[in-house]
Amino acid sequence: MLSRRHFLRLLGSAAVLAAGRVRAQDWEVESPVVTRMREHLQWVIGGMGMALDFRAIDQAQNEMFRIQINADNLQPVASCFKAFILPYYFLNTPVDEWVYDDNSVLYSMVVHSNNAATGVVLDNVARRVPGDENAVVKFNNFLLQIGLSGGLHSWNWEGSPTSGLTDPRFAPSLVNGRVVRLRGQAYQVDNAFTAADLARGHDFITRGEFFTSSDEVREALRLSKELLSIPSTATGYQSPIERVFAPGYTGKDGILPASDIQTGRVVNDAGAITAGPDTYIIAFMSAGESESVALDVLREVIGQMDVYEAAIGGTRLEELIYDS
């Protein structure tokens, strides 16, 4: 459980947000409806190479439930982590130098998922962050500050100024256990995250603006969500979650073809869906399974969101589809 008090401590540790004292309440015992939801999703995922962190936030910014299935298992991350570069950029760049229009390198990074642009943003921000560490290490330090437990090992792409830079803390290794384990095999994948970490990052983006007294921080997180919410109609591309349920989606996906990685095809998507006053954070990771199977599982996750809304007398999915 991530209570509001715990969330505030987490944000305070980042030295970027300040908030007043609030009560820690949230949930202490999993409700029967959530237990049924969790058991259903465990049955759906079974022994497949998938991981899920699925949580709900109410309008008072309390966490209503959290369902985690293989959520602490490392999986290839593809491009999902790029969502977290947005607050990293905004919180380390003077407001009068923020550039995020559709011709900017930041836009290219997050909307078009340009890998070279990602390296340029990491390099540019690192030059503003104090210390002698390289750009990959500095970004990872930010991830740790906002509550994640992992980070990038490297970002080696042609045209990227981060090529050749590494963070030894997150090097793949059979010795320290930083490997992706699928179907009894261990794979040393260069960049691996957990679904739990992806959910933590989106929790920071989703709730952070409500707990800060800084207008600058609030605007940084608001803009991060705005860029992550650019509709597929603007790009002609839909993420896996959007292909299942597009209304109210804010997030970043990542796809790797089987020819590019030894684990087999990677299908990742992480973000938030707004349903009336409630927000659902979904972090889904799949490796070695077909895209059609991954989409089927995401349909089940979205279906359980509807189950929960029905149980609490909330907003049904057909209402969201109609409103969109």
Predicted regions and their residues:
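N-terminal secretory signal peptides and thylakoid transit peptides that target proteins
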Residues: 1-14
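Beta-lactamase-like hydrolase cores
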Residues: 24-73, 304, 308
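Structured C-terminal helix/loop/strand segments within mature extracytoplasmic catalytic/sensor domains
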Residues: 26-38, 190, 199-201, 205-324
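Active-site-adjacent helix/loop patches that line small-molecule binding or acyl-intermediate pockets
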Residues: 27-38, 101-199, 204-208
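Extracytoplasmic
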Residues: 47-49, 80, 193
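Active-site SXXK
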Residues: 74-98, 109, 282
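Short, well-structured active-site flanking segments
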Residues: 91-108, 113, 213, 217
